[in-house]
């Protein structure tokens, strides 16, 4: 009998809780919970006005450089931090190609980053960081070990060997050139440039029904808080903007779209889905701990999930970094930074697609 009474009481509370914003003496309940309703805004339609679009190039504490081989269709993008910056990362895909990412774990002896490298070439492309380290050392950047400078560099690569020439990959020389360019000037260019040169999307059916993608950028300001995102979109899945598919798997004649999710569910192309990765970095002026930065990267990944379908699969190496630029000067809640980053992530992914569109003839020539 007591059990029935308890269950009935729980159900009544649950029903009331579900309607707390519509009935059950809403205002009285809120006052009992200690919520100040005096200046509450019930209509959130004006919330978008609080967020201001910001050119990525206006972010302070970061400079971007690129280098690519347009014949081989592969390249490198270097994010250089004149003042070494704290960072963390989350690896969400099943097949990453990366350098020094474990160093960014909050449980490690984390050191500030001098540069972050994105490249093509899959595991071969990791050689690009050797050139980046050399460039940084030449310019006097790095952790002072007492025996010389040790530049702290992390890297993630996309698999672009199926586009262009697979026997030519980013190497030490290309990495050196991209870093030299980053130190000399700030060039956050979108589309088929740098690490985005060989990026493609929508590949459950192979390259013949995939489409070109690239690298994209977006940034926003909320009060004094600034958040920017750079992303190389090289996904297995389709790409959506505001719920509308803008790139991805096509029909055989390339005149229409096919759902990448449905293709995976039907398991029609299980032998052709390896070799994908979307790599992104969130940059902010917020002062955050390494643990908080890792959480920001995690929350920001929800922007990927809204834009890429499917995402984080075993056939992807999806990775998200989060960097507090120049140590970060703005105090902000980690949730605010993460949610804003997730929204900016969507914008950057769309930018990567819209800035990299090419004619089908050119695309098919490179596969």
Stretches with model-predicted labels:
Residues 10-19:
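Bacterial N-terminal signal peptides
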Residues 135:
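Active-site catalytic microenvironments for nucleophilic, acid-base chemistry
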